Swiss-Prot record:
<dbReference type="GO" id="GO:0016410">
    <property type="term" value="F:N-acyltransferase activity"/>
</dbReference>
<keyword id="KW-0808">Transferase</keyword>
<dbReference type="InterPro" id="IPR045378">
    <property type="entry name" value="LNT_N"/>
</dbReference>
<protein>
    <recommendedName>
        <fullName>Apolipoprotein N-acyltransferase</fullName>
        <ecNumber>2.3.1.269</ecNumber>
    </recommendedName>
</protein>
<feature type="active site" description="Proton acceptor">
    <location>
        <position position="269"/>
    </location>
</feature>
<dbReference type="InterPro" id="IPR004563">
    <property type="entry name" value="Apolipo_AcylTrfase"/>
</dbReference>
<keyword id="KW-1133">Transmembrane helix</keyword>
<feature type="transmembrane region" description="Helical">
    <location>
        <begin position="192"/>
        <end position="212"/>
    </location>
</feature>
<keyword id="KW-0997">Cell inner membrane</keyword>
<feature type="domain" description="CN hydrolase">
    <location>
        <begin position="230"/>
        <end position="470"/>
    </location>
</feature>
<feature type="transmembrane region" description="Helical">
    <location>
        <begin position="85"/>
        <end position="105"/>
    </location>
</feature>
<feature type="transmembrane region" description="Helical">
    <location>
        <begin position="482"/>
        <end position="502"/>
    </location>
</feature>
<feature type="transmembrane region" description="Helical">
    <location>
        <begin position="162"/>
        <end position="182"/>
    </location>
</feature>
<feature type="transmembrane region" description="Helical">
    <location>
        <begin position="58"/>
        <end position="78"/>
    </location>
</feature>
<keyword id="KW-1003">Cell membrane</keyword>
<feature type="transmembrane region" description="Helical">
    <location>
        <begin position="125"/>
        <end position="145"/>
    </location>
</feature>
<keyword id="KW-0472">Membrane</keyword>
Length: 506
């Protein structure tokens, strides 16, 4: 305990280990109690530190979290980006060192302005607000990297029932509050009224989560729809090879021709690995086949659009043909994968910065949803499904959710299963069915409670068959989003700052 709370390298090393523990609480390990241990160690580790010492302690925690939880970055850079093992390792370490600052800054803010060791109840509430703030901030700053939120650990745990009420961030707030209160219970015993309030605040989110876990916030807006989702399992080395184009198109054509009757036929991200205008004949043929069978065909395909200046913008898109309509352009792009920041400086340095289709433009904000079989479908391409607020905006207008992805970049790492877990949380938050079609897994159907009903294992070629049900009505989260929680956090911050100022003048 003394090493955790005091300054110095022993405490920093424990913070490093504490950050890594969160990874074990998330998919694919799912030992969720460890997230409470991790957050509690972060909280205790800042108790006696100066702001400068807290800055280092927070950075160590962030480095441990991202070092363990995003180790798949090395696979993407080395295996698929063409970088040497040494260079890939160096780039990964630089990336992790940079994003670890997401924890260094809130740790400094905590030690500088918010910490109130003399008032454990107020301290616990303020810490919960800070914990939520750091998660929201790292999902927003510089387009965001909303990965490894602590709330995802509760997908199959007691707090899952809070997701439709306030999203994954409400769960994270509850975890931060729980961890801090557990650390402070012995200090609350001095005053029985404070102890009673502390126990009430400790139990409330867990009781509410369990009570709401099986509550249905939405209801069907139509009959079940049959789905056939294709998983081609195409190697990334073949994906953009022009000599392999016809083989890939033939693969999805034949899988579709041989598939069972379905209302929705879904192909993954960039299943058509050529510009839409170059594949119009192929898409028209497949659309006619789908329409003749009473189905809508939804596929990922790159799209080129004129800008009006004799130039073109390229988009990562989804299009619907057959008994459906609409094209959607991806709005949340993956840095370096789909666009290169500072590209005039970085392009040409290593092949990782010159990957095929790494110069996409961002899709407009006001796009219409896809339509298929008379229903509105909220589309998310790969990385987009990890943004809670962004996903909520589209989900609120929809009957069904759809995410298409190419998780080949992750290799055999834990990345694809983390990605799947976040998609499950989006379905739970929205109270809607989700269709998830990927190139190499995990292709799955997810129900409104975030549970997988059917799936195809990773690295297998096949067709997933199942049913989804269009849903209407809004969960509280889709209706209010995170505004109530944001207001509560601001009030808690204000309370902590005011109380600290008063205590200094007394």
């Amino acid at each position: 305990m003394r090493w955790i709370t005091r300054p110095g390298w022993p405490g920093n090393l424990l913070a490093l280990a504490a950050g890594g523990l969160t990874t074990l609480a998330l998919a694919p390990f799912d030992f969720w109690p460890l997230v409470l241990v991790s957050v509690a160690m972060f909280y205790l580790g800042l108790r006696e530190l100066s702001p400068r010492q807290a800055l280092a302690r927070g950075w160590c925690y962030g480095f441990g979290l991202y070092g363990a939880g995003t180790s798949w970055i090395y696979v993407s850079i080395h295996t698929y980006g063409g970088a040497s093992a040494l260079l890939a390792g160096l780039l990964m370490l630089l990336f992790i060192a940079a994003i670890a600052l997401f924890f260094a800054l809130p740790a400094w803010v905590w030690a500088r302005w918010l910490r109130r060791n003399e008032a454990p109840l107020a301290d616990s509430l303020a810490f919960a607000a800070l914990w939520l703030w750091q998660e929201a901030f790292r999902g927003w700053f510089l387009t965001g990297f909303p990965w490894l939120y602590s709330g995802y650990s509760q997908l199959d745990a007691p707090l899952a029932g809070l997701a439709p009420v306030g999203g994954v961030w409400l769960i994270s707030f509850a975890l931060g509050l729980t961890a801090a209160l557990l650390c402070n219970l012995h200090r609350l015993r001095a005053r029985k009224s404070f102890l009673a309030m502390g126990v009430l605040l400790l139990l409330a989110p867990w009781v509410a989560g369990l009570a709401l876990k099986d509550h249905a916030w939405t209801s069907p807006s139509g009959p079940p729809l049959k789905v056939a989702a294709m998983q081609g399992n195409i190697e990334q080395s073949m994906k953009w090879d022009p000599q392999k184009l016809n083989d890939q198109l033939a693969l999805y054509r034949d899988m579709t021709f041989r598939s069972q009757q379905a209302d929705l036929i879904v192909w993954p991200e960039t299943a058509v690995p050529v510009l839409k205008e170059s594949a119009e004949g192929y898409l028209s043929m497949m659309g006619k086949f789908a329409a003749d069978r009473g189905a809508a065909l939804i596929t990922g395909v790159p799209v080129r659009e004129p800008t009006g200046r004799g130039e073109y913008s390229y988009y990562n898109g989804i299009t619907v043909t057959g008994q459906g309509d609409g094209t959607y352009f991806k709005q949340k792009l993956v840095p370096f994968g789909e666009y290169v920041p500072l590209q005039d400086l970085l392009r040409g340095l290593i092949s990782f910065f010159d990957l095929p289709m790494s110069d996409f433009a961002r899709g407009p904000n006001d796009q219409a949803l896809l339509q298929a079989k008379g229903y509105h479908i909220a589309p998310f391409i790969c990385y987009e499904v990890v943004y809670p607020e962004f996903a909520a905006g589209l989900s609120a207008q929809s009957d069904l959710l759809l995410t298409v992805s190419n998780d080949t970049w992750f290799g055999t790492s834990i990345g694809p299963l983390q990605h799947l877990q976040m998609a499950q949380m989006r379905a739970l938050e929205a109270g809607r069915w989700m269709i998830r079609a990927t190139n190499n897994g995990v292709t799955a159907l997810i129900d409104p409670f975030g549970r997988i009903t059917v799936q195809i294992p990773q690295f297998e070629r096949g067709v997933l068959y199942g049913e989804v049900v269009p849903m209407h009505e809004l969960t509280p989260y889709l209706h209010w989003r995170s505004w109530p929680l944001a207001i509560v956090c601001l009030l808690l911050f204000g309370w902590a700052l005011l109380a600290a100022r008063i205590s200094k003048t007394v």
